[in-house]
Amino acid sequence: MKAILLTAGEGTRIRPLSASRPKPMLPVADRPLAAHTADAAIDAGADEIVLVVGYEGETVREYFGEEYRGVPVSYAVQEAQTGTADAVDAAREHIDGPFAVLNGDNLYDPAAIDRLFDACPAVCAAEVSDPRNYGVLSTTDGTVTDIVEKPDDPPTNLANAGAYAFPADAREWLEVPASERGEREITDVLTRVIEQYSVTPITLDRWLDVGRPWELLEANEWKVGELEPRIDGAVSDAAHLEGRVVVEAGATVDPGVVIEGPVLLRSGATVGPNASVRGATVIGEGASIGNGVEVKNSVLSRGASVNHLSAVADSILGRNVNFGAGTTVANRRHDDADVSFTVKGERLSTGRRTFGVVAGDGAKTGINTSLTPGLKLATGATTAPGETVDRDR
């Protein structure tokens, strides 16, 4: 079965992290988000991966190439992001039999994807506490009978998780009309399949739709926690490592460092003397942590630097971010309420009591900068030495 991965979207809700790469290519543990989905599809038996690309599509092509894990890779271009059915329709020429459709910005438990492929036609569902914000599946005797978008009175608590195994006939049903929000929806294709076939619901044990920065942090918490410990890099005998810690070849850990996993140090990463790194944390390729720095539950992307005597917690730093010496990130409110974050101009609760900052590629702080919880630094943003920043910039 071919697996079609949807990776064309820009990911405006996760900006500034998606300013130069599509959301499915943001780092989750040791690979891009979309690679986890591709891995699950291949493990389930996919004999070809078809990647639908659009925004910054060359980033996707550079990573996956023409073959991934021994499986052929093809590409389809979605010229304008006008819905999920439109995205799959862009890959129509690659469809010659039953096919799976997976969102490239979702994490699925791999065992469920395996069951999805075996049960075709089928759709993955997740049990949620409040299904009113999702497409909700109705079922009878183990068969899906309907799907309703964001109902006021949900018939079940089964949310559509955006993973489908379709029969070959569905290729001819992709040209659905635009919905009320102006998009061609893959759920309309699912409705047609439900009318013609017995569709099996596959309940996910775990699922994460990564749409906003704190969900990317959660994705890393999930996947870093699954890594098998190994030490391939240079670790000082005077360093202390415990728990699930991965030090890739080319990474360096200096004397006096304390690392409490789960932590991943990518190739070329350096952790300076007397630093403290706690899970779940990813230190990306070529990223560096200076003398006496504390990093907790954060993602430092490729080439990021946190200089001496700084503290970073529950944060995401884009590529080549540079935090000057003594930069301090606050990650908790005094009233212990959930931290809020601005998404597309709207202040939203993250649902987390601890959340620090999100810094776009190339952002820089002056020495002794203080950053308040839930702060966003745009691509290339700067701060002055000694500044306290309590508004996005």
Regions found by a protein language model. Give the residues of each.
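Conserved beta-loop-beta/alpha segment of the NTase-like Rossmann-fold superfamily
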Residues: 60-62, 66-141
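Glycine-rich hexapeptide-repeat left-handed beta-helix
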Residues: 290-393
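Catalytic-core segments of class I nucleotidyltransferases/pyrophosphorylases
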Residues: 100, 117, 140-225
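N-terminal glycine-rich phosphate-binding loop and ensuing alpha1 helix
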Residues: 1-61, 81
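The repeat-register position in solenoid repeat domains
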Residues: 249, 266-267, 279, 285, ...
